[in-house]
From Swiss-Prot:
Organism superkingdom: Bacteria
Enzyme Commission number(s) from the entry: 2.1.1.166
Protein name, per record: Ribosomal RNA large subunit methyltransferase E
Keyword annotations of the record: Cytoplasm, Methyltransferase, rRNA processing, S-adenosyl-L-methionine, Transferase
């Protein structure tokens, strides 16, 4: 019965995925994922990315966010990206493949950032979902806590943080942590985010000194 349930759920997800207008548009326009449209909407609302910035992209593969941001930064901008999964090269993106939770990978990522602070940290990280919120939410919260730690390490005063978070236990406390570190915090649900998904995007600007 469980296998049949999973099979039905998987079939429904595939049907929804391939009929999704954002998936179709991404494929038609040569974008790497529908996440491109989520970040475009955030940029239109919050004007985060500007030419010449340095940006850290966590959970970068397959590259939809990096692909969008590299267009906003111009030739003098820089993106340092990391993901457990491989990602095809993008001009202007320094990609590190590895598990962000691993201390050696984190050190390698910090080495690539160097001594200069960055203007934006963005995270689209998510755990492998089991379909059980009691399991998935804590795993997700662990990842977003690590992303916030990255902000504390490398984000310049006045910098911005964009992070995907799944609503559930721990969300309000996490939002409170972000509000203590930034002057302006918004919770966004882009049109390209599926309505039945728990995911939202916290957009925080003006990192406090």
């Amino acid at each position: 019965m469980a296998n049949k349930k999973r099979s039905a759920s998987s079939s429904r997800w595939l049907q929804e995925h391939f009929s999704d207008k954002y998936v179709q548009q991404a494929k038609k326009k040569g974008f790497r994922s529908r996440a491109w449209f989520k970040l475009e909407e955030i940029q239109q609302s919050d004007n985060i990315f500007k030419p010449g910035m340095t940006v850290v992209d966590l959970g970068a593969a397959p590259g939809g966010w990096s692909q969008y941001v590299v267009q906003q930064l111009g030739n003098k901008g820089r993106i340092i990206a990391c993901d457990l999964l491989p990602m095809d090269p993008i001009v202007g993106v320094d990609f590190l493949q590895g598990d962000f939770r691993d201390e050696l990978v984190l050190k390698a990522l910090l080495d690539r950032v160097g001594d200069n602070k960055v203007q934006v940290v963005m995270s689209d990280m998510a755990p492998n979902m089991s379909g059980t919120p009691a399991v998935d939410i804590p795993r997700s919260m662990y990842l977003v806590e690590l992303a916030l730690d990255m902000c504390r390490d490398v984000l310049a005063p006045g910098g911005s943080f964009i992070v995907k978070v799944f609503q559930g236990e721990g969300f309000d406390e996490y939002l409170g942590q972000i509000r203590s570190l930034f002057t302006k915090v918004k919770v966004r649900k882009p049109d390209a985010s599926r309505s039945r998904s728990r995911e939202v995007y916290i957009v925080a600007t003006g990192r406090k000194l």
